[in-house]
């Protein structure tokens, strides 16, 4: 035989238990070089700067038109 719960879990108890599993929005900051939104302590994906230094240089993509 399987184990059966002794009492029904109330909505309040269920919601209290699930309160820590909510998804959190990322904390975005603006880039000091290009003012686009980026994650803090990460290189800007638009300009390649981090702490006012150029870390990554992007190559220009040429269209075949």
UniProtKB/Swiss-Prot annotation:
Signal peptide feature range: none
Gene Ontology biological process terms in this record: translation
Start and end residues of each stretch annotated as Disordered: 1-21
UniProt xrefs under HAMAP family: Ribosomal_bL32
Pfam families found in the cross-reference section: Ribosomal_L32p
Domain of life: Bacteria
Record-level Gene Ontology MF annotations: structural constituent of ribosome
Organism: Mesomycoplasma hyopneumoniae (strain 7448) (Mycoplasma hyopneumoniae)
Keyword terms: Ribonucleoprotein, Ribosomal protein
Biased amino acid composition, Basic residues: 1-19
Name recorded for this polypeptide: Large ribosomal subunit protein bL32
Similarity annotation: Belongs to the bacterial ribosomal protein bL32 family.
